[in-house]
Amino acid sequence: MTTKIKAIVFSMMFSVLSTFALADKPILDVTIPSSSSGNSWAEGNLLSDALNRMGYDSKVVHTKKCVNNLNYMSKDTGRPAVFVRSAKRYIKDESRDCKVEITDRTFLTVFYKRHQTMCIRSDKPFTTISNFLKGKSRVTVASTHSLPDGIFNSLSQQTGVKFVRVSYKGSKNIIKGLVAGDTDLMYSGFTKREIGTDTINCFTTSASKEVGGRVPMNKLFPNWHLNETGSVKYFHAVNIPEDRLAKVKADLAELANDIKIKPYLAKTFMTPGKDIANGRKVFDSHVTTILSTK
């Protein structure tokens, strides 16, 4: 009996101590206003795990869609949170009348910027873009169907070679078109698909400086208005007290050094938010660029 009582007392003490330890941790949940599959779900869980490693009490709150997320934000749950949103998602939310206002208080910091790339087939000889274009009067460029026809006009003016867009639905089909020899070049997001496809050679990115030995587009095409464009995601604040905002912003920026997030960003050469000056301005600029193509 004595042993049983000791075990019960020990268990109660452990439970109480655990509760106190948890209570000492600052709370910062991660809401995910999307399906439980795909990139947003994976990133949300990745971030929550990293926040726990950093010393936060963090849980994933699956709100599933924008309207639910907006309703969650209006409640006093007692648990501050963040969610990650891209410029494209922001525009889509607005178009569906699910308005989640971005202010200086709710825009915490940029999570990352994913860059664009331009590629050729790897079996084609390539030294520089100038040599590749030499002697050509026209080149075709595989790109997503959502881009406007005139996106490459300034490239044509700069190089004297006409860049003609060929539309495809999805990056997988863009690559297929290039590999099949249907186009001379391709222009798309720089993801693990592009990096991992050995039949293509992605020779440049829209990063502001050289990454992975690739000369930046701002050097190859200095007059092109999209030479530094890319997909930007930011952290949006959900009911974070005013006196905690500065600390949360600093901690979110430091997540780029987390043991899981750092390699996640590095494998596709994404630029972490902590390395981006004027993150809000960069995000707003990306929104403007997307809207100008519609």
Locate each region found by the language model.
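Bacterial N-terminal signal peptides
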Residues: 9-18
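Bacterial N-terminal signal peptides that target proteins for export
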Residues: 1-9
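Secondary-structure junction motif
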Residues: 142-153
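N-terminal (or domain-start) structured segment
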Residues: 22-104, 147-148, 158-187, 192-196, ...
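An extracytoplasmic/periplasmic, membrane-proximal ligand-sensing/linker region
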Residues: 24-28, 53, 163, 243-294
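C-terminal lobe and pocket-closing loops
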Residues: 113, 192-257, 285
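A structural signal for short loop-to-beta-strand junctions that line the ligand-binding cleft
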Residues: 98-117, 140, 218, 222-225
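Flexible hinge/capping segments at coil-to-helix
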Residues: 120-138
